[in-house]
């Protein structure tokens, strides 16, 4: 790959969200360094200073890569407000690269040294600067954050309008981009909590709150524009259009509209927007606070919730890492502004009674939200969303169409859903809990599977609200009815529910999922989905012992030997790898003839999909003495490993060398078997061209062979040296021929040449496998 192609690939991989010019400059230099780095490693410095110089350059390269990755994965808003810090990181990366390159200049040939000087000169002439537009946006957001502390005296319309403009200038102009931004902010919050950086956490939480507000505006703008025939969406660069759209949508939140005033005149009390009401008390908040999930509640209500022993978010049911409360001055200012606009008094205290049924109130809040949404559907065009009644039931669920405009389908934030997610999930759960109708339940389970596919919050919510038990009951009914299609749907829904969620995996284990899977694997039609679920569960440490002691082990091993779908076989192999990392499972794996199955995969022609993972499983098995013994005694295993040394890629070669090193260590018989395969040329090649770990392992294996040869040759050399007896044999040769008789010592003379001949024969036979190792050149393997 030339420098141009490498640069294109590296920068395409980074895809910087912000600071693109600086990323492009650094990426270009980084590609040039990476293109000559193999030559730098090939110089093989032997001195301590040379090795340290290479290590220093490698660290500098990693720092530069990390900066590019940071600019490609981090939140745009956070990158904007930390522009000065990012600029400093770029400068430090440049200095580190210059220093590292100068240190390796003296240990490389002059041809490479000239390239290094050229790169150093380019780096020294590089000047990193922030984009003026991006810096201006960052300053605006920082000013907004500083005003947040004084938000009681600030107009909510002004704050949201400034934030909306800033987000638009950062190209956050669609619901999809807003979703990606919210997810990036959530990751930053998690990182700040892990680092216990309270200041960073509060800043990012405030940005996330404003981002959620703007997400509604982005989506509503699209709906309004689509609702008007012949109208076109405003360009992201047209600030005037964006501001007008922003003001129009802000009115729909009830902040500056006239409808509440009309309601007052007609004798009706204005209804506060949902964002200003506590999800528990459903009343206008007096002292709003933010909890770890990002939701806002009345302080007294959420404190009562926590004092009752709960450690989850009442609205999302998300497990909370901590129960600390952060005042939400933004919402408090919005409440004050709304009360002023609608002629109502600002709440002077919390609700009088806190003896509340939290779940019922949250649900009723959802129902009121749903009612408002349904009443306003007439003025919207909800493209990408349609309401589909289930057969033989009045339950209504939402089916999302896969069109370009169905941006709602990827949004995992319940605040952005037109039809309340909580109500929708409860409808789905109600269908699953019905006594009859497996076919109807199967359709619901399929919808649940699709909902869970890419929605982490849905997994958290459903896992905490009885969906695990309901899906397991459905799967049990499908197994009892021998319904293969229903079994597949149920197993894959459970699979999606368990993805990246150990709590849901634990619930499945305690609820008897292994027992159901053992019933499923008795039918060949369900092998694919059962294997996939085994794979997912095997990622949990607590599940490895349970699965390892069940019928799953022989079942998964047998799949490796069958002609089945590639994905199913790969799932089985990956599951066995996870199980093999738990050493008490190794005896059960060996008793199921897993070594024979792995040897078959390694020896299969035309399929390289299994080699890397098969070798990884073999390495785990070889960690036990029983595994080593069986691998060495298995017919064809050593030959298969030797073939991988010849034909595999560098990663596979590294694993094969590691396997052979473990098997040969302390085993003379295994060493002879390996040498008979003629592996010396391959090992020498890997020691030069392999991965760093592969080079290290191959050199150790060659050294092991050399030590073994020296140990075997040493006794033979002692027997081959008769310094005093040799002249005696020559002096006795004449008398034997002259006198025609054999003296008493003749028997000794006759014996010694036989011993010498035998010793020479042994050394010759031993040296044959090493012929390539000791010669200066070689061409092909014997």
From Swiss-Prot:
GO biological process: protein ubiquitination
Entries under Pfam families matching the protein: U-box (PF04564)
Stored InterPro entries: ARM-like, ARM-type_fold, Armadillo, RING-Ubox_PUB, Ubox_domain, Znf_RING/FYVE/PHD
Domain U-box: 271-345
Metabolic or biological pathway, per its Swiss-Prot or TrEMBL entry: Protein modification; protein ubiquitination
Comp. bias regions, Basic and acidic residues: 707-729
Residues that span the membrane, as ranges: none
Region: Disordered, residue numbers: 707-765
Statement: the UniProt record of this protein carries the keyword Amino-acid biosynthesis: no
Biased composition (Polar residues): 739-748
MF-aspect GO terms: ubiquitin-protein transferase activity
Keyword Protease on entry: no
SUPFAM superfamilies to which the protein is assigned, alphabetical: ARM repeat, RING/U-box
Catalytic function, reaction form: S-ubiquitinyl-[E2 ubiquitin-conjugating enzyme]-L-cysteine + [acceptor protein]-L-lysine = [E2 ubiquitin-conjugating enzyme]-L-cysteine + N(6)-ubiquitinyl-[acceptor protein]-L-lysine
UniProt keyword annotations, A-Z: Repeat, Transferase, Ubl conjugation pathway
EC number per UniProt: 2.3.2.27
Function: Functions as an E3 ubiquitin ligase.
The protein's name in its UniProt record: U-box domain-containing protein 7
Record organism: Arabidopsis thaliana (Mouse-ear cress)
